[in-house]
Amino acid sequence: MKRTDNIALIVAAGQGKRAGEGLPKQYRQIAGKAILAHAIDNLLAHPEIDTVQVVIADGHQTLYQEAVGDRDLPQPVIGGVFRRDSVINGLKAAHDRGYKRVLIHDAARPFLPKTVIDRLLDALKSSKAAIPVLPVVDTLVNQEVEAVDRNLFHRVQTPQAFDLETVIAAHQAWTGSDEPTDDAQVVRAFGKKIALVTGDRLLEKLTYPADFSVAEAQMTEKMISVCGSGFDVHCFEAGDHIMLGGIKIPHDHGLAGHSDADVALHALTDALLGAIADGDIGTHFPPSDPQWKGANSTQFLEYAVALAKKAGAIIDHADVTVICEAPKVGPYRPAMRKHIAQILGLPEQRVSIKATTTEKLGFTGRKEGIAAQAVTSIRLPDILC
């Protein structure tokens, strides 16, 4: 892909204490994904944005990595004491990478329509700076409760777009005694005119606890519910235990397989892969590959969960049925349920582990092996919306 010389900078070094729940708001999840990840993905999806540079607080490295997963991004930059310090650090990183234009965005704005980015980049063709704004619709009064003409004011949003050299020079020249509320204020003080483009109501900043409930509802209303099913079989062989649902169960036989032959986790992995329509366990972990010889099947399910989350999925429920005459599954059901719930990120109440027999019919009835079937329920973004 041809480089456009446009980079996005997300300032995510704040603590966000007004949002509640202790976790910095940029790392809280809506619709199964960190707010920061939503902001990153919206920017990366635009064909005129080359990459996204994120600025984080020192000590947030683990939170950041959990939020972004395996997205192909530059290493995060550590922020400073104040927002402007963080912006400067991010701008330096963008400059070092040779970019010419930058879009500076708040991490706490998970909704970003492509049309807003289009308008900002178009404005930069004839201006050194551009910001998205909306009209003020509420009545405004001063502290003496005197009406103020709202037509003289705009609500300013992000991302704010700048010629990179200009915004760096503006920050270097800033002499204000107070911290600026945004970067447009810094550039305006530097004597540059700011172009105004139409923003979007979706670009609301998440600040207070109630904002997150609204954002969750907005995000999930554009999702569809889908199911996936999986089935697996392994025959018995010599051994003294089997792996089932990630739990070691003593038995007078083992299960034959290239990996640890955990039929429950294999069926569940296939169910999750089926829900996101991404092949099957054999596609991702072929038995012909020696690296999976004797592998713990927990990693297969963890991999499927990561793929599902990358696809924007919310996992809602899992149901596993083990089919065998022996061993007895009941005593190990709570441990299996707990193990699977932890991998899926679900409460145990949303994981069902059942066991049945075939009334001595077929290969399972003859105690020749074990079968398992699984169903998962998830929600995915509706690509047609």
Curated annotation (Swiss-Prot):
Gene Ontology BP terms: isopentenyl diphosphate biosynthetic process, methylerythritol 4-phosphate pathway; terpenoid biosynthetic process
Cofactor or coenzyme needed: a divalent metal cation
Superkingdom in the source lineage: Bacteria
Associated pathway: Isoprenoid biosynthesis; isopentenyl diphosphate biosynthesis via DXP pathway; isopentenyl diphosphate from 1-deoxy-D-xylulose 5-phosphate: step 2/6; Isoprenoid biosynthesis; isopentenyl diphosphate biosynthesis via DXP pathway; isopentenyl diphosphate from 1-deoxy-D-xylulose 5-phosphate: step 4/6
Site (Positions MEP for the nucleophilic attack): R150, K205
2-C-methyl-D-erythritol 4-phosphate cytidylyltransferase: annotated segments: 1-226
InterPro entries in alphabetical order: IspD (IPR001228), IspD/F (IPR026596), IspD/TarI (IPR034683), ISPD_synthase_CS (IPR018294), MECDP_synthase (IPR003526), MECDP_synthase_CS (IPR020555), MECDP_synthase_sf (IPR036571), Nucleotide-diphossugar_trans (IPR029044)
Keywords noted in UniProt: Isoprene biosynthesis, Lyase, Metal-binding, Multifunctional enzyme, Nucleotidyltransferase, Transferase
A GO MF term: metal ion binding
Reaction equations catalysed: 2-C-methyl-D-erythritol 4-phosphate + CTP + H(+) = 4-CDP-2-C-methyl-D-erythritol + diphosphate; 4-CDP-2-C-methyl-D-erythritol 2-phosphate = 2-C-methyl-D-erythritol 2,4-cyclic diphosphate + CMP
UniProt cross-references to HAMAP family, sorted A to Z: IspD (MF_00108), IspDF (MF_01520), IspF (MF_00107)
Function: Bifunctional enzyme that catalyzes the formation of 4-diphosphocytidyl-2-C-methyl-D-erythritol from CTP and 2-C-methyl-D-erythritol 4-phosphate (MEP) (IspD), and catalyzes the conversion of 4-diphosphocytidyl-2-C-methyl-D-erythritol 2-phosphate (CDP-ME2P) to 2-C-methyl-D-erythritol 2,4-cyclodiphosphate (ME-CPP) with a corresponding release of cytidine 5-monophosphate (CMP) (IspF).
Database matches in NCBIfam families: ispD, ispF, PRK09382.1
Family stated for the protein in its record: In the N-terminal section; belongs to the IspD/TarI cytidylyltransferase family. IspD subfamily.
PANTHER family: 2-C-METHYL-D-ERYTHRITOL 2,4-CYCLODIPHOSPHATE SYNTHASE, CHLOROPLASTIC
Protein name: Bifunctional enzyme IspD/IspF
Organism: Zymomonas mobilis subsp. mobilis (strain ATCC 31821 / ZM4 / CP4)
Gene: ispDF
